From Swiss-Prot:
Entry similarity comment: Belongs to the argininosuccinate synthase family. Type 1 subfamily.
Subunit and interaction comment: Homotetramer.
Organism: Pseudomonas fluorescens (strain ATCC BAA-477 / NRRL B-23932 / Pf-5)
UniProt keywords, alphabetically: Amino-acid biosynthesis, Arginine biosynthesis, ATP-binding, Cytoplasm, Ligase, Nucleotide-binding
Protein's UniProt name: Argininosuccinate synthase
SUPFAM superfamilies in the cross-refs: Adenine nucleotide alpha hydrolases-like, Argininosuccinate synthetase, C-terminal domain
Length: 405
């Protein structure tokens, strides 16, 4: 094995990463530093400390990254109205660059020469973690146990844990049949019955949202205040970024908003079915497009829409820390200078309905757009010349016999 003195492990305290911790100690004979991120996944993270201590770990990091996650990663992504392949709001993808960043920061603080993660060799996360790590610390060593060991089933992991005295729950409360990932933006479900693309997902799978059919019969209205493209207040009450998202998750979940069942194209080449709950993100996407509709210039809005799929792909495939993503982010952020105002929404049985938008910087001019008498604000006769000039190239082509029918 490569010479490794100290490694920082992205550690959840679960079976996989607990086995990895012991495996690193035995295989590399190295000191392990554990890092557990609180990204709003809704589970207690402190038990990870006790588990790590019981396994001889002396340097343990448990960091509350919720505000940084939403402020510096989720909000910048939503300024671009980012959606991967038309549906996926990138809840897992956007969390990985922050974890990679913190892994490298801790490696620098502790003098570690390697990092390790529990991502499998089949998924996107291995790419996301490692591209981020190499961008931030080019010489770092990366240990990916799932690409090295022969513990390729849950049963083998549990046998290894029992053999080495790692606390596990082989019996007890029923384990979810799905592979799940959660943070403040979303919760995802993969595997189990979802591996058959024709099988309908089970209703009791969902954790955050009620079924739209069982959502309240009375709609709820909500006002979101924007400043430079980011939400700063809900119903007039100013909130921090993480509080905004947590509140929207709760309200959206109550109204059955944000469920997805999709098949996506993984970066490693395979197709994968996943179900997602993103109630707050679904509301934010709809509201942000609404405030941009009155504050962005037409060509700026269209250019953003053209670039968004590329931006989304960069995030999905792990290139958050790349120069091209940073370049696109500067352009996106510059476009948000005038994206200020308030959007009013109606939430009803899984639907997010825009019912109003207003801004002191609105480019909507009712005097020009009106269907009534406009007092000469717009001369309709000007449209004739506009149309003729735009038709000129097509008329020339037609005169040359280049007819389309």
């Amino acid at each position: 094995m490569a010479d490794v003195n100290k490694v920082v492990l992205a550690y959840s305290g679960g079976l996989d990463t607990s086995v990895i911790l012991k495996w690193l100690q035995d295989t590399y004979n190295c000191e392990v530093v554990t890092f557990t991120a609180d990204l709003g996944q809704g589970e207690e993270v402190e038990p990870a400390r006790a588990k790590a201590q019981a396994m001889g770990v002396k340097e343990i990091y448990i960091d509350d990254l919720r505000e940084e996650f939403v402020r510096d990663f989720v909000f910048p992504m939503f300024r671009a109205n980012t959606v991967y392949e038309g549906e996926y709001l990138l809840g897992t993808s956007i969390a990985r660059p922050l974890i990679a960043k913190r892994l490298i920061e801790i490696a620098n603080e502790t003098g570690a020469d390697a990092i390790s993660h529990g991502a499998t060799g089949k998924g996107n996360d291995q790419v996301r973690f490692e591209l981020g790590a190499y961008a931030l610390k080019p010489g770092v060593k990366v240990i990916a146990p799932w690409r090295e060991w022969d513990l390729l089933s849950r049963e083998k992991l549990m046998d290894y844990a029992e053999k080495h005295g790692i606390p596990i729950e082989r019996h007890g409360k029923k384990k979810s049949p799905y592979s799940m990932d959660a943070n403040l933006l979303h919760i995802s479900y993969e595997g189990g019955v979802l591996e058959d693309t024709w099988t309908e997902h089970e209703e009791d799978m969902w954790r955050w949202t009620v079924s739209p059919e069982k959502a309240p019969d009375t709609p709820q209205y909500l006002e979101l205040t924007y400043r430079n493209g980011d939400i700063v207040a809900l119903d007039g009450v100013e909130m921090t970024p993480a509080t905004v998202l947590a509140t929207l998750n709760r309200i959206g979940g109550e109204h059955g908003i944000g469920r997805l069942d999709i098949v996506e194209n993984r970066y490693v080449g395979m197709k994968s079915r996943g179900c997602y709950e993103t109630p707050g993100g679904t509301i934010m996407l709809r509201a942000h497009r609404a405030i941009e509709s009155i504050t962005l210039d037409r060509e700026v809005a269209h250019l953003k829409d053209e670039l968004m799929p590329k931006y989304a792909s960069l995030i999905y495939t792990g290139y958050w820390w790349s120069p091209e993503r940073l370049m696109l982010q500067q352009m996106i952020d510059a476009s948000q200078a005038h994206v200020n105002g308030v959007v009013r929404l109606k939430l009803y049985k899984g639907n997010v309905i825009v019912t109003g938008r207003k801004s002191d910087e609105s480019l909507f001019d009712a005097n020009i757009a009106t269907f009534e008498e406009d007092g000469g604000a717009y001369n309709q006769a000007d449209a004739a010349g506009f149309i003729k000039l735009n038709a000129l190239r097509m008329r020339i082509a037609a005169n040359k016999g280049r007819t389309l029918v």
